[in-house]
Amino acid sequence: MTLDSQPCEDQIRALVRGLDKAAIKKDDYAYYPEGGGSHSFSFLRSTNCWANTAEAKSDHEGSEGATTFYQAYQMRGLAMWAARSGDKQALELAGKLARYVMKPRFWGNAADPPHVVGNEQGHVDSHFHARMAALRGLLEYGIVAGDTRACDFVRSSYEYIRSYGINRIGFTPYLYDRNSPAMESCMLGDFLALTVKMSRAGIGDYWDDADRIIRNQMAERQITDINLLERLSQNAPKTAVPESQPGQISTENVHERMLGIFASITMPTCSISGVTMQCCTGNAARGIAYAWDGIIDGQGDEVSVNLLLNRASKWLDVDSYLPYEGKVVIRNKTANRISVRIPVWVDRSKLQASVNGAGRKLSWVGAYVVFSDMKPGDKLQLDFPVVEETVRLSAKTGEKEHTTYTITFRGNTVVDISPRNESPDVYPMYLRDHMKTAKKAPMKKVRRFVSDKPVLQW
């Protein structure tokens, strides 16, 4: 959609008016009730509007047990539209929803120490995907409206959520029932959206978090091996699936059709469920796009490289040899000034840079090394040792139990992890022996498309 498309713009403004009419308004806030239906998103089930307009008493209400979830997408969509159109009604409604979502009764964790006021800092105790969807809506509104309180709330809540699990590999349990030790893949998209947007907005520097997620849990949760998938299917417990609609169940080429989807419920080293919810594929796949978009930021003749991942763009191309080699080649097209963010694990004293083979002195601005007076066609190369490190980190694997994992990293990339679940009824992850032994990055020739227009507006 473009804003010069009048029919689309008229329809969106009508949608905003409809959302405003449907919202329950009180004082300076507004909300959409759960509705009393049989599904989490029981919006406007009849022409008489809501069956039940009662205001929620906690965040654990509704079939998803997540009151703030039911405001999340409306809040984000309204704020995004306001940013693009200047629609004051949309921004005002987003603000009212934000004030409802941030009410202290929806936040907090009883396990917090007495002196920690967790319900004012976005602390949570359940359903992290639903909470982060609400945080995404709050963040969008906070950035568009310049609401520092909303942005600060999101930052605090994000940092609290990532303290669960093993943040360094991008694993965080989703706590659907407040005791679940597994992670839902929907959260991968949430995490990448929050890390990229907060970093760009200057709310914090979370690029290393994004790098760890995309290189590890995101890459490993995508189902790509049909043999492992068939093994899981043959050994997993058999359950009867009721057919609610004619033709709803299909048994044709199921494994082949599943390749590329994202596993729903996983532990740090494997997928543990023979069932996949397709919400996870939709949300996780968008996370890939968020990370891809975040690799490069360009404006005029100034470009920032935020993530050392492969990316072609109209400004420059990034060729990353990580994790095999400590080498990144940037082929300049139009930039005069290139800023490259260096990951936290790189030893800055051993970082070297050259332009067209000639050494360059390093000039730092925070975590970025800056190169000025670049010319079209210049080849900028960064070289540094790849640090291999083995650490022991723990994650909850039962209602009370924790498992300590021995994890070997090359930079931010996991190349080995143990103990593993060797059961044939799981889909194993981190089968990365090739990353442990290879000293040269594998190469292949591909054709890449570069758009001259913005690809994403999210």
Predicted regions and their residues:
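Long, well-ordered core segments of solenoidal/helical folds
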Residues: 11-29, 92-112, 149-170, 212-223
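Solvent-exposed beta-strand/loop surfaces of large extracellular or lumenal domains
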Residues: 348-373, 390-397
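Beta-strand-rich binding/interaction modules
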Residues: 335-355
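Catalytic-core region of carbohydrate-active enzymes that cleave or remodel glycosidic bonds
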Residues: 143-163, 179-226
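C-terminal beta-rich recognition modules with glycine/proline-rich loops and embedded aromatic residues
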Residues: 94, 154, 207-223, 227-235, ...
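N-terminal catalytic cores of secreted or lumenal carbohydrate-active enzymes
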Residues: 1-62, 66, 77-78, 82-85, ...
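Well-ordered alpha-helical scaffold segments within catalytic/enzyme domains
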Residues: 1-7, 72-88, 133-147, 189-203, ...
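Solvent-exposed loop and edge beta-strand segments that line ligand/cofactor-binding
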Residues: 1, 37-72, 106-140, 144-147, ...
